Amino acid sequence: MADRLVRATAAGGGIRLVAVSTTETVREARRRHDLSFLSTVMLGRAMAAGLMLASSMKVRHGRVNLRLGSDGPLRGLMVDAGRDGTVRGYVGDNTLELDPVIDADGNHSFNFKAAAGTGYLHVMRDDGKGEPFNSTVELVSGGIGDDVASYLLHSEQTPSAVFVGERISSQQLHSSGGLLVQILPKAAEEPALVELLDQRCREIEDFSGRLDRCGDQLEDLLVDVFPDLDPRPLEDADASQSVNFHCRCTRERSVAALLLMGRTELADMLEKDGGAELNCHFCSNNYVVSGPELEGLIAELAAAS
């Protein structure tokens, strides 16, 4: 099943909804980075959140970066998501596993707080027009959903609910995705609707289970979560779009980046290693640069000096 993102409204247009399925996308990230169970879940949640944030950008080439900077053993993470449905990312420690925690109902879950530790969520929105918008908020839980909701409230003054979840077993990742809920400005002036939406969001239990049951049928997920709010997908080309893991790195860009190192360092690299091997943090692609290629770069720098 292909991953997708759905935009919808509810309560007669007073509520904005965005739902995303990222199962195949996160599986690809896990394969590329050889991620542990915990790091798979953390990165997957951030990918879903990044895509949902990017979905509201007005320009097709707009992008959102989420960076978790913290003192926990995960050593942070980074996600780059686009309005076009592409996303990539990495974690600081792709092998991290911690003992699970048990909630009041006896269910086991990942210890996101211990993995993330204390720190900040940094968000950058770039629409390609002038300087990107940057904002930083303190981490709330490390589970990504609450942290992104805090960003939306404090940095964009938009009260929101952000749900992210997954189903994972010792065999594979079964499902992954998220749901963004926002009340629109005019509807925010209706206390009864605000109270009803708040109540419905608090009543959502086992979001991961609901997501898993609905699969990529995100319209069914919206009805399952908000049956009495009449959720309806948008009636235009933006109602639904595909989502996939995609990295913009290329060999040409990577080789060109070597020029920034300067002649002295490149000459030292040539003498010691006879070439270079470049690795992209976002997708783990490796690019090998031969000795003659390095010599050509050194000559190019010499000619320009």
Curated annotation (Swiss-Prot):
Any one GO molecular-function label of the UniProt entry: protein folding chaperone
Compartment list: Cytoplasm
Cellular component terms per the entry's GO annotation: cytoplasm
Disulfides per UniProt: C247-C249, C280-C283
Maturation and modification: Under oxidizing conditions two disulfide bonds are formed involving the reactive cysteines. Under reducing conditions zinc is bound to the reactive cysteines and the protein is inactive.
CDD domains reported in the protein's UniProt record: Hsp33
Keywords from the UniProt entry: Chaperone, Cytoplasm, Disulfide bond, Redox-active center, Zinc
Signal sequence coordinates: none
GO biological process, one term: protein refolding
Gene3D superfamilies, per database record: Hsp33 domain, HSP33 redox switch-like
Keyword check for Membrane: no
UniProt keyword Zinc, yes or no: yes
Entry similarity comment: Belongs to the HSP33 family.
Purpose of the protein: Redox regulated molecular chaperone. Protects both thermally unfolding and oxidatively damaged proteins from irreversible aggregation. Plays an important role in the bacterial defense system toward oxidative stress.
Protein name as catalogued: 33 kDa chaperonin
The species this protein was found in: Parasynechococcus marenigrum (strain WH8102)
Gene this protein is translated from: hslO
